[in-house]
């Protein structure tokens, strides 16, 4: 079993994805460091559920980076609706169609899916634009 961590920009829907074998604070911290390197913009806030992987060590790591960490209300996944909706897309458009031969292959395929989602997949919220087209438009 693998656990997918997802970061999604609220304004553009640009996403970063990574899979881990466990939900741990160390993995959550690694993921934050990953998205800081990956996203072409400054991250001002990270919103998470109240899972054990997002507690004290994670919280203070994020705050020390100058990023606000906000928790959603317990038992309220709808408050993280963009992530939840993107997970449904992942399930329908990626995982259900996936055949892979191990962890390395899964990571490579997930990277391909992330690239497709960000650069080629049209989004209804942006009148058919991709997340990176929406980002370019916001920056121009």
Give, region by region, the residue ranges found by the protein language model:
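Acidic/histidine-rich, metal-coordinating catalytic segments
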Residues: 23, 41-55, 75, 127-132
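C-terminal domain-tail junction helix/linker
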Residues: 56, 65, 89-140
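An active-site-proximal beta-strand-loop segment
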Residues: 1-16
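Short small-residue beta-strand/loop micro-motif enriched in glycine and branched aliphatics
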Residues: 14-18, 71-72, 96
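RNase H-like polynucleotidyl transferase catalytic core
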Residues: 45-50, 62-82, 98-103
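Hydrophobic (often cysteine-bearing) scaffold residues that line and stabilize catalytic clefts
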Residues: 28, 47, 54, 79, ...
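Distinct, well-ordered alpha-helical segments
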Residues: 32, 58-59
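Active-site beta-loop-alpha junctions of metal-dependent nucleic acid enzymes
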Residues: 1, 17-41, 45
């Amino acid at each position: 079993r693998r656990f997918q961590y997802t970061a999604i920009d609220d304004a553009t829907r640009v996403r970063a994805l990574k899979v881990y074998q466990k939900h741990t604070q160390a993995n959550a911290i690694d993921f934050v460091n990953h998205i800081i390197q990956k996203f072409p913009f400054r991250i001002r806030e990270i919103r998470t559920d109240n899972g054990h992987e997002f507690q004290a060590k994670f919280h203070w790591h994020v705050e020390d980076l100058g990023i606000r960490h906000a928790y959603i209300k317990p038992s309220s996944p709808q408050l993280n609706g963009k992530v939840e909706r993107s997970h449904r897309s992942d399930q329908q458009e990626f995982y259900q169609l996936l055949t892979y031969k191990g962890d390395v292959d899964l990571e490579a395929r997930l990277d391909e899916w992330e690239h497709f989602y960000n650069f080629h997949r049209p989004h209804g919220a942006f009148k058919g634009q991709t997340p990176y087209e929406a980002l370019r438009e916001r920056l121009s």
